[in-house]
Structures are given as structure tokens and as C-alpha cells.
Amino acid sequence: MERTGVLSKSAIIEREPERQPGGERARHTVVYLTRKAEFSASHFYHNPDFTPEENRRIFGKCNNPHGHGHNYTLEVTVKGPVDPRSGFVVDLKDLKEVLNREVLDALDHRFLNKEVPEFFHTIPTTENLAIAIWERLKTKLSMAELHRVRVYETPDLFVDFFGEE
């Protein structure tokens, strides 16, 4: 199965841009750009400090050690000024490359508990997955500031992480 990779992008302008001489947008205009991607992974929920009964009661079917899978949707939002020369807040090729290398290559078609180091001792909930993705990206995005990581486990369940508050 081939990874679907990047699905779409969106940009939100924080406020109306001002014009500078020559028609260039003001450098202080902040734009939020979101790149969307999909990946498939499996996981299970288990806390070794809980009794078997507690694990079953708290995590239900998600406590099955054989795991279950999801087709996750990831949205990564960066923010920054619009470059007056290119018109971009970020070069999308660079952003796609970082997402592929740091996130999709590491998580796609993986059993998170057993194949992804962040989850060897951490329960791979959607909350913890969003935090782990943030940690993977926060120092790799030199082209713009990481603003938000959104992870959809299902179409009606997602987590937003904005970094440490």
C-alpha cells in the first residue's frame, strides 16, 4: 500500500496585509499554513502499573496486546511572515520533506508500542502521539515556526497540541 502523503494545504492570514512600495506585502504579516498528511499505524493501550482488571476497565478493547489500527490524519501548522520575494511563508517542498523524514517514514505502517521509541514506555494515545510528533518537528522546521500539531485518530476525534504553554 502506497502512502497517500500530502493531501492538502491551507493558509490563514492573521490580519489584513498592508502594502509596501512595489506591491510587496509587509514583512510583519503573520500567516498560518497547514500541511495535511495521512499515515496508518497500530497500537494498544496498557499501563504496566495497573492490574489486568484496571487495564481492561480503563482501556477496554484498546487493551488488546495484539493491537488495533487507525488511518490517522495529521495536520501540521506553521506560522511566519510572508517572504516578499517568493510570496511564501514556507517552501512547501521543504516542509513536505521534513514531514516525510521525521514523521511519516517513522510512523507509517508501524506498531507504535513496539517499533517507535517514544512509545516503548509511553501509552500511544492520540494525545501522546501529537506531543511526540511536535517533539520530532520542533527543531527541524527552520523555515517557519511550528504553531500546531493536530492528529485525527478518527474523523470525529482529534487532538491539538501547541507546544508547551
What are these regions (language model features)?
Residues E2-E165:
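Charge-rich, low-complexity N-terminal segments
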